[in-house]
Amino acid sequence: MNNYNKIWEIILNELSKIYSDEVFKETFSNIKKINQIEEKIIISVETEFIKNKIYKMYFEKIKKITKLKFEEKIIIEFVSEKNKKNSNFDDEKKHFENLKEKLENENQTYFSKIENNENNDEFQNNKYFETIEKEQIETKTDNDKNVEIENRKISFNKYNYGNTNPKYSFDNFVVGKSNNFAFKIAKKIAEEKKVTTNPLYIFGKAGIGKTHLIQAIGNHILKKTHSSKKVLYVKADGFIEEFTNQLRKAKMEDFNEKYRDIDLLLVDDIQIMAGATRTQMEFFKLFDYLYLNQKQIVITSDKQASELKNIMSRLTSRFEAGLMVDIQSPDFNHRLNILKKKILEFEPQNPLKIKKDVLDLIASSFVNNVREMEGALLRLLNYAQTFGYDIDINIANEALELLIKSKKSVSYDEDVLEKIKSVVSNFFNISVRDLMSKKRQQKYTLPRHIAMYLIKELKDIPYNIVGSFFKRNHSAVFKAYQKIKKNSQSDYELKKSLELILKKINS
């Protein structure tokens, strides 16, 4: 056999042509020691986690490279540093002899076409090649397998896998013209055995069903596989917070183990990552890792990838390389169907009968946001149930008076509000998340007050409604508005900033 260090160098060189630098270095820079027992090369890595990851993600490709590059039989085995210290050399040698005997009795078969090898000339000239195994040669003991199964059970509890809300399913998603394509694609992904569409990027305004659809994918897969798949749902702000906390506590190994040892990642409201540069860099590494290992990624946003602001281009380009599907605001008939479905869910055993004029009132009053419309219906149903009323148009007007009045009098354009928040954040070089937060440093409070002022000034929205956007009360918004209005008359820099921001908003 050739020098075993040289053999490993050749294997590493081929792996570096297949995987990105970041993925390659993160995994294979942790090699601690290389030993040899006859035809077997034993490679020691830093932790049990890295060892398991190599077996799960890279071992098949390592075996293919070994078979292609070397005429003699070579067996590669990975052990963690701790396990290697505790191993007995004689036992290891005996295990090797048993493995060797098994190897010589194996039937030969053929691998399918080699993947991911455009830059490798030798791979290009060898489109098909033999493998020495009919099934993967076992290099783990029964005890190792039992530990792995037990660890998988523990990780489900430790990392809260399968955390989707069970109320969201494909069965209770009301399909219409505005969301039919997105629905069909989502269901196709949930039912496929192999990953063929990656990533799936679903975009549309707030409150029109993106969260329902993304979680329905996860729930369908969990139900189909009896929860054996590792599905993880996370809102972008939750990802930011978790990454920041784990980084501060120096627990990034736990973070990586949680997010990389999964089968399906569901990320809601990716636009919230705007301006969070370090988090974006970490998400980029995670995205590439999952993508290269053929793990499904599904993302939602309030806008298409090309319109995302303060999100690094190498992320948006990856989103655009997948399948982008949009969900539009539902038309009138679609909204009526949604209301009827919700009524059935409210009292499934004894469905309420609500007259068409009542449903028409709700459907015509809440046009752009299904979530708001469902909230109005729920208020009406509970109002009538609490007071023992039969639901008619008069009771509906009475129960929903304030909600309908605010919708008619405000009639605000949600896109304009989002644009104001985005422009102000960009102008002051902070994230939208920080703008909407409760941080009290001057660099956050001034932009926040300006955003409140502009929303009130430009759209003439009541203080309490503006406050609801920022999770503040009427008084806080009133004070912010008065402060900016007064100071802009004497503070030249503030006045100039307002003019520049307004110019960007109107452009």
Curated annotation (Swiss-Prot):
It comes from Onion yellows phytoplasma (strain OY-M). Belongs to the DnaA family. It is found in: Cytoplasm. This is Chromosomal replication initiator protein DnaA. Residues 163-384 are annotated as: Domain III, AAA+ region. Its main location: cytoplasm. Residues 1-72 are annotated as: Domain I, interacts with DnaA modulators. Oligomerizes as a right-handed, spiral filament on DNA at oriC. It holds the Pfam family Bac_DnaA.
